[in-house]
């Protein structure tokens, strides 16, 4: 019996969870599960529970399903589980059970065509907790099949001990079927980005559980501020994806601000769990300082790149202006007439150092390839292979000078003249042997070497070289005067071999740098006097330019041929084997090197003669 001064009543201690549970059909053949409590978690599961207040004793409890809206009518869905029959739960409890827990209750839904039959069954069983008129019970049009409520009824014993005294029924919160989009739990599964500009307008792709496109919105909330994402019904894809644009924030910010983003259903004001969204400050550069910095940086990099790669300093229409030190320019820059500035690089030298920088003006060849008569001495035909390329046309800017004094032979042994282009890898006799007509004009005077018939001595050993190309005229003298020896016969059967070092660049051709001079016959060394060496360089240019015979002249067009070359002076036996001399024959044999010449600074004879020991023979 009831105890206390107050009437007993029912109080729900634990409400059922409203969302997250799926209603099962009978045909699915599986249990409908258990209705969890409102505060249930994975680690601490709870279930709906009630407590009878102001009463201690035994009784009976009945649980049925009713509709969502008032008046609460019996619902066609069934309640299934332990102690359930005909779609409702009923069980007695004793005095020791307080409170009452219901952990084996499930909801099984019926098909739409079975709704009316299920309602009639409830009426026959007397399941009408709120005594709704039968006429209203038969009206099933307003019945929502996706939402139910639990109705708790308690019966206490009467005077005769029968459990007939009913306490006022109590209904729980609505329970929604998780399959229905209009009642399902709202949940944000994933977004493609969780930050955006404070000005809004960022496009976001949001994945979610099933929603209704006409009953859903995206809400941004922070304290008292609220805004909605911008999208239309066409932006809801198959009820599981929403594409929207973020709304602008309420004010300008200087630091990121985090707000809450959530889904909300307007029909029942249901909201999802919130997700953080961060508004970023506007990074717009009002004065364009960032663009200016980028432009300045790019311009500076371009200037540095142009200076390093090209090094262009000045363009001269007359030719190529180039520092003597450094690597030579490319072929493309030479042909375009472009001036290239290379950094100065010191070079060691035996006879002096190169100045701060000199300018070389590129000039064409003196002689054309057609002007050279292709005839070779019979004795050296195997040694005179073509080596240098054919020269191009050249202006006749050099004056014609008289021929030198006649020399004893018209044929000379082949002498190798390696240049920087040849890499100094050719043998001693790997140069071309060519002749030039006697009436050739514009031959450099310092390169003329006459060949005559009046010097036919068999013991004559002839050698000629230039030690100051710019400051002197053509050099020619008899063999006796050439060597500064009173008796020319002392040089008979004396083979002379002179070696020079090759120059590294075109700009250093004025440094002969003679290394050795070997007179193979010991008798030659015995008659040479150091004073004779100095006498050789003190000869006047007027005496060296004597001679009027315009015989065929053997020449070398480039002064650097004397540098980096191996000179060999043949004795009388080799000179005689080359054939008879003919001073009037325009096809007289000689050797020639086809190239271009460069203007070269002069070198004092005093420095040249004093730079070597007395046993070296300088010419």
Curated annotation (Swiss-Prot):
Which residue intervals make up region (Disordered)?
399-437, 572-593
Subcellular location as annotated? Nucleus
Q: Where is this motif: Nuclear localization signal?
A: 290-295
Q: Where is the RHD domain?
A: 8-297
Pfam families found in the cross-reference section: RHD_dimer, RHD_DNA_bind
Q: What is its main location?
A: nucleus
What domain of life is recorded for the organism?
A: Eukaryota
The chain residues annotated with the modification Phosphoserine are: 267, 503
Question: Compositional bias of type Low complexity: which residue ranges?
Answer: 399-420
Annotated Gene Ontology cellular component terms: chromatin; cytoplasm; cytosol; NF-kappaB complex; nucleoplasm; nucleus
Q: Which SMART domains does the protein's record reference?
A: IPT
Q: How does it assemble?
A: Component of the NF-kappa-B p65-c-Rel complex. Component of the NF-kappa-B p50-c-Rel complex. Component of the NF-kappa-B p52-c-Rel complex. Homodimer; component of the NF-kappa-B c-Rel-c-Rel complex. Interacts with NKIRAS1. Interacts with NFKBIB. Interacts with NFKBIE.
Name of the featured protein: Proto-oncogene c-Rel
- Record's compositionally biased regions (Polar residues): 421-437
**GO molecular-function term, one example from the UniProt record:** DNA-binding transcription factor activity, RNA polymerase II-specific
- The record lists the organism as Homo sapiens
Residues that the record marks as modified (N-acetylalanine) are: 2
Illness: Immunodeficiency 92: An autosomal recessive disorder characterized by recurrent bacterial, viral, fungal, or parasitic infections appearing in infancy or early childhood. Patient lymphocytes show defects in both T- and B-cell proliferation, cytokine secretion, and overall function, and there is also evidence of dysfunction of NK, certain antigen-presenting cells, and myeloid subsets.
Q: Which InterPro entries match?
A: Ig-like_fold, Ig_E-set, IPT_dom, IPT_NFkappaB, NFkB/Dor, p53-like_TF_DNA-bd_sf, RHD-n_c-Rel, RHD_CS
